[in-house]
Amino acid sequence: MAKRDYYEVLGVSKGASADEIKKGFRTKAKELHPDRNADNPEAESQFKEANEAYDVLKDADKKAAYDRFGHAAFDGGMAGGPRGGGGQGQGDFASAFSDVFEDLFGDFMGGQRGRPGGARTQATRGSDLRYNLSITLEDAYNGLSKQITVPSSVACSSCDGTGSEAGAEPTSCPTCSGMGKVRAQQGFFTVERTCPTCNGMGQIVKNPCRTCGGAGRQEKDRALSVNIPAGVETGTRIRLSGEGEAGLRGGPAGDLYIFVEVQDHALFQRDGMDLFCRVPVSMVSAALGGEIEVPSIDGGRSRVRVPEGSQSGRQMRLRGKGMPALRGPGLGEMYIELMVETPVNLTGDQAELLRQFEESCKKTNNPNASGFFDKVKSFWDKVRD
């Protein structure tokens, strides 16, 4: 059966660049990988076909020969061809896939291939830590400096983080030759695993520190001072560089991340930089108008005029009475929402006065109620018809 055009196999044009050819192969490799196509018997042959095409097109000399002579350049019929006949062997097939193996799976494998000369050092960076800090809304408005206690691993005081007793030197791991990983060939794939002897460190401590057992660090609570800027909100993350766990055997420390949680407030609800406050007003004040006093987050008070005829839910804005910006100048707004309170626990005289008031009211005194009942009457009339 005639071979397919290599460019067609990879789904690229004949004028494709090296990056486009590599991208085309990566796409095909993911699509046709046997592990993803167990129920497709043709996938394996197509997978090999894609590898064969990439092995030629990735190489400038082979690509030039293919562009000039086609498949004849590699079938043994062209004297002086780049392969000299004989077809492609398994070594080239594995090599072709190896070129993009790290692109496909590099992040999963930790980004290290364990090539010769790439031996790992025993020093390993410490882990990052998370600390959840709960503060009040007032703290978020003003900002504060707070002392916290963080349980973490710190450099061992006995061995200064080396993991070895004084004067003892670690030796290269005999299992992985200092690589920290061992490799195993599985078909066309080379699989890397953490060395079971040194746990990926690449070195073995023959005379470990008695205090830390060779880890180079020990558990200890640390007191830290954290500066919380004004304007933070729930979810704000503050990074303290080098305040995480100590590194293994002299490695650099990780970072500490403070995650802020702002507590709910009894008076204010927050939306970004804006604050909302629901304020009850009497029925008389809402009807006749007047002034009310409202609190502000800075501890002060503000006088607010209630317009005549105000209804429940009416909002009024106080400029500059909200939360500060986390970065840069500026303050948000505070919105006052009126809640008209219906009187309760009335005396007989009070109830009678309200009845007299009700009898004296006209439709214009209660436009919403009048309009609503007019709509109800119209609805019932239509239902009867």
Curated annotation (Swiss-Prot):
Transmembrane segments: none annotated. Its cofactor is Zn(2+). A zinc finger (CR-type) spans 143-221. GO terms for molecular function: ATP binding; heat shock protein binding; unfolded protein binding; zinc ion binding. CDD domains: DnaJ, DnaJ_C, DnaJ_zf. CXXCXGXG motif repeats lie at residues 156-163, 173-180, 195-202, 209-216. InterPro entries: DnaJ (IPR012724), DnaJ_C (IPR002939), DnaJ_domain (IPR001623), DnaJ_domain_CS (IPR018253), HSP40/DnaJ_pept-bd (IPR008971), HSP_DnaJ_Cys-rich_dom (IPR001305), HSP_DnaJ_Cys-rich_dom_sf (IPR036410), J_dom_sf (IPR036869). The keyword ATP-binding does not apply. Zn(2+) 1 binds at C156, C159, C209, C212. Participates actively in the response to hyperosmotic and heat shock by preventing the aggregation of stress-denatured proteins and by disaggregating proteins, also in an autonomous, DnaK-independent fashion. Unfolded proteins bind initially to DnaJ; upon interaction with the DnaJ-bound protein, DnaK hydrolyzes its bound ATP, resulting in the formation of a stable complex. GrpE releases ADP from DnaK; ATP binding to DnaK triggers the release of the substrate protein, thus completing the reaction cycle. Homodimer. The J domain is necessary and sufficient to stimulate DnaK ATPase activity. Zinc center 1 plays an important role in the autonomous, DnaK-independent chaperone activity of DnaJ. Zinc center 2 is essential for interaction with DnaK and for DnaJ activity. This is Chaperone protein DnaJ. It comes from Jannaschia sp. (strain CCS1). The gene is dnaJ.
